[in-house]
Amino acid sequence: MLNLLYLILGIICGTITGLFPGIHPNNIVALSFLILPYFGLDNYIPFLIGLVITHYFINFIPSAFLGVPDDETAVSALPMHKLTLNGNGYEAIVLAGFGSYLGVVFSILISLFLMSILHFDVRAFYCSIKIFIPFILIAFILYQIFTAKSVWEVLVIFLSGIFGIAVLYCSEAFNITLTAIFTGMFGIPLLINNLKTYKIKSQMMAFPDFELKFLKSSFFASVAGFFRIFLPGISGAQLNYILSKILNERDLKNFIVSQGSIILSNEVFSLLAVIFIGVGRSGVARAIQLLNANININTAIFSILISSTIAIIILLNLSKYILLFIRKVNFKFLSLFFIIFCSLVVIIGSYNTYLIYHIIVYLTAIYIGLLAVKSNTNLSNMMNVLIFPTILYFLRG
């Protein structure tokens, strides 16, 4: 019963972090040395699970309504924001939330099937495919280049990749570094673009029709999320990007469902990987790994399911009130507020970790993002900021 109270506390904290762009569960994890003595190990883990699961559900709100993503929602933010500008913001939230919940369920079923029934050897499989990963990514970059529709698109691909190598491979990266990169590339340029908008359209508060193809997309997205266990250095947003290119999904609703699934499946698999192979692939999962706690699989799954159920209820209700609020305020001033807020997050977050360096990174990311927006380039091409350094990481061995 006590664990459930701490799980709910984590859900409350995840709701808060999810609402504000630039605030990440890793910021809470960084305070572990302060929180852990008061919570105790057995209570702290449910708190972290509730925090991270809820965060990614609620984070669809700033992604959809403002177009401001984090490192996981970078690919899905733009199509969701487009629906908001067209008066269908709530529909975007419902689709993403529904896909996320399906992703959680499918991830748990896939994990139990592979690990408990088939006794799948994850470590052996990873060792067998590791050597091929950089070549798969190189082929993927070549595919992007040859299918590019303009010189600007190719330029964005290479600028993003070179920028990623300089910042993430050749230099030391911190938690705030990714925040500066993704907020600068994907968030601020869209917020600057939003400065032209004074009011958003009246929003339809209706649930979209359920389609069976949502289940198929969600399942394949969850399977793709499973591969994150084998790909250190590759984020959920990269997998989102690669999956979107492979599936060539043209149905916007189906695309948002699949993106919701892969975002949550990434995190669920990251958490369960700590139990199955002793390795965490996300900031929160690594924090749990470092605690060296003996985690019961049933407790973990129960915590994940409870968190997801409560989180989607919060998401569907809270988003209605926020949409009504946004309709009443000047959208230009709201966008300006979040430009200032996101910039302050980067400045404060990097105050003790090379402030000037991170400001330069942030401004460079904004420049590349503005170039992509103004040239009407597919913003997902900027995900090469992670793919280029990941290739070098694997080639280095």
Swiss-Prot record:
The chain crosses the membrane at residues 2-24, 44-66, 92-114, 124-143, 150-169, 173-195, 255-277, 297-319, 331-350, 354-373. Signal peptide: none annotated. Keywords: Cell membrane, Membrane, Transmembrane, Transmembrane helix. It comes from the Archaea. Pfam families: TctA. GO terms for cellular component: plasma membrane. It is found in: Cell membrane. This is Uncharacterized protein MJ1079. It comes from Methanocaldococcus jannaschii (strain ATCC 43067 / DSM 2661 / JAL-1 / JCM 10045 / NBRC 100440).
